[in-house]
């Protein structure tokens, strides 16, 4: 008799995706982040659901409803801080996951990679709208500044911004629609993640060497389930350490002041995970140019398969490309730091140089390094 997990229509899908899935025998801990992102999404949906039960999306009561959650709701404070810091953990895992894809050439799985980039944009949109909901000073001004960027689009810009706002400024209509979108998007993300997995399982996983592993596969369970559980435990350890000891470490103190349209904070900045893109935006004096650079800083990922000039897939045996990859990581950390600094000397010039370096590395230096390495193979 066939095992029920292999014959039952529903369990068969789960079995083929998480139990009997043939996986390469040599994938490292860098392959843990996919499952960690799944766990992050589940944590965010669950904590978000419980927060939504007590939150009111009205400009008059939004801020006090968040205060009420923290003060009066049973364990409301832990749910709120798990949700806020869970977003940070989500982005840490996302950046590691994308970095792994760049390093090991996983972007050659075109469909999987493209869905992944769409997922990245969707998660960023969700996080941005979620940051607006507590209706603190940084929520309000962040929403005003970022939505206002769309006015740089020629001809339709102003109308587009007012359409998104639902009026002539960020107000009640904006908050209500942002709450609606923030609630629905995680479920769309979950659906997209399933499509992401569907495409991945068509080709099978990549591995650190970048060469086919068809002749050396092992079952996902128990080998990688146990490995993933270790990753999950470490993720929860870091998350709960943040939540229970320094819940406001990654937040902005300005967001503990209720939103006031008449008082602009001295330094408007987004959450830490958007700072690199914000630094690129600010480093270009022209508004439309800045917006284009901002979008391109993420959209450039779509073009990675086209920029791949190497004869090898992975960077494992390409020291020159490895060096440039880690310079790119350092450059992104520099941009993140600059994004949180005021617009004054010497931060302006550092930001501009780091922005130029970012695009140069991806568009010019890495493809050229790959070609040099191709020629070195002939020696």
Swiss-Prot record:
Organism: Moschus leucogaster (Himalayan musk deer)
An annotated GO BP: mitochondrial electron transport, ubiquinol to cytochrome c
Protein name: Cytochrome b
Binding site for heme b b562: 83, 182
Chain ranges passing through the membrane: 33-53, 77-98, 113-133, 178-198, 226-246, 288-308, 320-340, 347-367
Residues engaged in binding heme b b566: 97, 196
Co-factor binding comment: Binds 2 heme b groups non-covalently.
This protein's encoding gene: MT-CYB
Family, per entry: Belongs to the cytochrome b family.
